Design a protein with these regions (language model features):
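Mature extracytoplasmic domains of secretory-pathway proteins
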Residues: 62-100, 105-112
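C-terminal motif of bacterial Sec signal peptides marking the signal peptidase cleavage site
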Residues: 24-28
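Helix-rich interaction surfaces within compact, conserved domain-sized segments
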Residues: 95-144
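Classic N-terminal secretory signal peptides
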Residues: 17-23
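Short glycine/proline-enriched loop/turn "hinge" motifs that connect secondary-structure elements
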Residues: 35-39, 94-96
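Terminal, regulation- and interaction-focused segments at domain boundaries
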Residues: 41-60
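Bacterial signal peptide processing site
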Residues: 30-32
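Bacterial N-terminal signal peptides that target proteins for export
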Residues: 2-16
């Protein structure tokens, strides 16, 4: 039996649901066709694990401070946040559950926005001592 690839915890926990979500989003209007309703925009989902090495999870206050200082200034037009629960299987066979936060951003797909998103990811990893922040990009038809 092959050993699993050394992926980060959050990647393992969310791979299948994210692939399914990505496939559904792409089939909605990501095939190069014009949107029947609304306009095509880029959609980025960011998955932030809340567990830390010292067993003290990222608090709601710390999370909101991060959003207020790192995310909102870069995406002033708005964003969506929600709580999520993931799980992943460690190499030793132990099933681990982890609470997380998800941010959904709609944007124009510019290099500047992509860099802003990568900066947000790096700031979170640095501030909260995380291995990774999962990023999923797709296109969606958006109407307000």
């Amino acid at each position: 039996m092959r050993s699993p690839l050394p992926l980060s915890r959050i990647t393992r926990a969310l791979s299948l649901p994210l692939l399914l979500t990505l496939g559904l989003a792409t089939s909605a209007c990501g095939d190069g066709e014009d949107c029947a309703v609304g306009t095509e925009q880029f959609r980025t989902e960011l998955f932030f694990g809340l567990d830390r090495e010292n067993d003290v999870p990222v608090s709601e206050a710390d999370w909101q401070n991060f959003v207020d200082t790192s995310v909102t200034p870069r995406f002033k037009d708005g964003l969506t946040m929600f709580d999520a629960n993931g799980q992943y299987l460690m190499d030793n066979g132990t099933l681990v559950h982890e609470n997380s936060k998800v941010i959904v951003l709609l944007h124009d797909g510019s290099a500047a926005h992509s860099q802003d998103i990568d900066t947000i990811r790096e700031e979170y990893k640095s501030r909260f001592h995380q291995e990774a922040v999962l990023r999923v990009d797709s296109t969606s038809c958006v109407a307000f």
